Amino acid sequence: MPKPTPPFNNHRRHTLRLAAGSAAALLLPVGRTASAQVPPMPKSAVTINVVDVAGNLALTQDAIEAYQKAHAQWVSKFNFTKMPAPELPGKLKAMQAAGRTDIDMVLTGTDFLAAGIEQGELTQLMPAFASKFPNLMANYQPAAAKMQELAGDYGIEVTFMPAGPLLEYNPDKVTDVPTTPQELLAWCKAHPNRFIYARPANSGPGRTFLMGLPYLLGDKDPKDPVHGWDKTWAYLKELGAYVEYYPTGTGAVMKELGEGSRDMTPTVTGWDLNPRALGIVPKSFKVAPFQHMTWVNDAHYMVIPKGVAPEKIAVVLDLMAYLLTPHAQAYTYDQGYFYPGPAVKGVTLAMAPAKSQESVKEYGRPEYDKWLGEFPHTQSLPPKSQVEAFRIWDQQVGAQKTK
């Protein structure tokens, strides 16, 4: 590993110093193309359109904008758009059918990653562009490297979160905190409509809850939602009788939790920390693990749709390489949105902007370290299985109650 970049002392929007030394030790120096397979950089500056379907810009936008300032000869500006993950496959399909892809890079969770691979909408990055990412797997944290494997040859992991599932609750309303799925069901029966979670196809906490239940319930095959999740599907259908509706995203869940219209929800490390740091959920709200839980890890990825012009691919690949340098990775601590955030080894909280350090210290939970060491970890479902799990949930669990 390279010598760590000195700690940040400035506001997170201060322009990043694109230190060639730190970049070179981890990846190729920004701007260098090491193979004829990698397209040449553009002769004049281009505009790059970035779509975020994961909330990842909270973690990476500062670094992306700093890249533009340092490389105005290649990129004149970045346009940023946010949309729900389930809407993007149809949008890309229409663009690609018309022969005009106006989206140059997507920042995504495992949801669109899975759908994009399944529907053949993504550019294969490896092995053609491997020269831009030397030692890629070795530079990831071990658990993050496992999540990179899910991307196959189509995505580059940029941020990592151990995730959950955990239960977040209002301690003034929930005094008998459930520690098993059975206890959660009993609580929901006694307190109908006070528990809520969002549609898994567009919610990190929702899909982590979905993918964590097979381990908690002792299902036949936690990696096979079609043939191995009999207990999970039966449980979710029964639980659904006491859930008023399923929001289409996690933001609505946290708003209702904070306003007091719900008392408990499944969560993950980042969605516990960040809404409290932002004042959406009271700081006093608590989280609890399930007994004998398995952590289902999560990640965000950078992908390139099919149909992007070669000169734009060159810029996006160079940006991706930069976003994996320790200096840029330190920004991903943010205010805990994807806690901790960095996917790359050796990126400590002391290297993050002061605001990030303050938020994590004030709103983080010391018990996380204990739980992360106490319980085993696994990865999110592989892309094809994840698509199947979302389809079954939509049809059998959420069909009448998602809005």
Where do the PLM segments sit?
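Early extracytoplasmic/lumenal segment of secretory-pathway proteins
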Residues: 39-114
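Short helices/loops that flank or line small-molecule/ion binding pockets
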Residues: 89-102, 114-119, 251-261, 265
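A bilobed periplasmic-binding-protein/Venus flytrap-type ligand-binding module shared by bacterial periplasmic
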Residues: 166-173, 214-216, 299-312, 331-332
